[in-house]
Curated annotation (Swiss-Prot):
One Pfam family hit: ApoLp-III
Name the UniProt record assigns to this protein: Apolipophorin-3
GO cellular component term of the entry, any: extracellular region
Function: Assists in the loading of diacylglycerol, generated from triacylglycerol stores in the fat body through the action of adipokinetic hormone, into lipophorin, the hemolymph lipoprotein. It increases the lipid carrying capacity of lipophorin by covering the expanding hydrophobic surface resulting from diacylglycerol uptake. It thus plays a critical role in the transport of lipids during flight in several species of insects.
Tissue: Hemolymph.
Naturally occurring in which organism (per UniProt): Manduca sexta (Tobacco hawkmoth)
Signal peptide bounds: 1-18
Length: 189
């Protein structure tokens, strides 16, 4: 999930930056600027709330929610990787290379999370760090992707923008659900 978020965020950043490159670019760039702004705020809020939840007194409930959340994050990372694969077939040049690199990094992040997954209850702190690192990696990949895609804005905007926006929206919705479940488990009396 975190890797998906990063890739989507990077794509959004790239699209919003590329919209600024040309003065005659369509006004549609504003949607990507809003998406980029939202992604930055979401990442900050997610990290802050996640860190505060780790100090929960309901350790058993929180660890279970963390394990369940990681299951759904892994599913979202797979879905995000599939979305990127679909976008790759519509892209060309540097945009295609950037999408492929982002997809590979998302899959690598998912694999690292998958390896840590069985030990969630035993090592919740280390797993928390891996989950947060996955979010950070995804954001960094999204920023790289955004820079690459920006150079091919017109074509990218027509073909990839709807796919990237949908993937981003799906990721954020899912991440908010996981965050809510973790919060409920941590504050359970």
């Amino acid at each position: 999930m975190a890797a998906k978020f990063v890739v989507v965020l990077a794509a959004c950043v790239a699209l919003s930056h590329s919209a600024m490159v040309r003065r005659d670019a369509p006004a549609g760039g504003n949607a990507f600027e809003e998406m980029e702004k939202h992604a930055k705020e979401f990442q900050k809020t997610f990290s802050e709330q996640f860190n505060s939840l780790v100090n929960s007194k309901n350790t058993q409930d929180f660890n279970k929610a963390l394990k369940d959340g990681s299951d759904s994050v892994l599913q979202q990372l797979s879905a995000f990787s599939s979305s990127l694969q679909g976008a790759i077939s519509d892209a060309n040049g540097k945009a295609k290379e950037a999408l492929e690199q982002a997809r590979q990094n998302v899959e690598k992040t998912a694999e690292e999370l998958r390896k840590a997954h069985p030990d969630v209850e035993k090592e919740a702190n280390a797993f928390k760090d891996k989950l947060q690192a996955a979010v950070q990696t995804t954001v960094q990949e999204s920023q790289k992707l955004a820079k690459e895609v920006a150079s091919n804005m017109e074509e990218t905007n027509k073909k990839l923008a709807p796919k990237i926006k949908q993937a981003y929206d799906d990721f954020v919705k899912h991440a908010e659900e996981v965050q809510k479940k973790l919060h409920e488990a941590a504050t359970k009396q």
